[in-house]
């Protein structure tokens, strides 16, 4: 009698649907997580590209004020082109290089920060926004006039 009971308890009939249900549930939970990681990677890359483009635009400006405006506009356009939605975006430009005399090497540094929105993804524990920062430094033309 005991051996028959042990054999009955060891049977694996009917475990296929249970295993499938567990596997499908795990996959369904992993898909939004993979999408979230993909979005974060895209946002990080886009913010870095925006910082690069903004620094380049600032470095070809004639004045520090123009550099700030150009960097902000280019960063916003680059992020919009890449489809990155920022809850809060800031562009910081170090324009101290515009104070140097022509003939001396001067730099302009740009930092772009974007709080990318992630709240529409159904991932438990995922913050609704995540901050990404990109920084880039570009050389101002050495022999061009500055003000």
Task: Give names to the regions the model predicted.
Residues 2-3, 60, 64-147:
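Short, conserved structural patches
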């Amino acid at each position: 009698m005991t051996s028959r009971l042990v054999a009955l308890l060891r049977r694996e009939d009917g475990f296929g649907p249970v295993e499938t249900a567990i596997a499908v549930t795990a996959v369904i939970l992993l898909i939004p997580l993979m999408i979230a990681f993909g979005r974060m990677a895209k946002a990080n890359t886009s913010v870095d590209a925006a910082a690069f483009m903004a620094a380049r635009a600032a470095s070809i400006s004639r004045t520090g004020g123009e550099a700030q405006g150009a960097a902000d506009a280019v960063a916003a356009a680059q992020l919009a082109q890449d489809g990155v939605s920022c809850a809060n975006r800031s562009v910081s430009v170090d324009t101290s290089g515009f104070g140097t005399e022509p003939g001396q090497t001067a730099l302009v540094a740009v930092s772009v920060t974007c709080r990318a929105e992630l709240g529409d993804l159904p991932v438990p524990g995922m913050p609704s926004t995540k901050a990404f920062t990109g920084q880039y430094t570009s050389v101002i033309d050495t022999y061009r006039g500055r003000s």
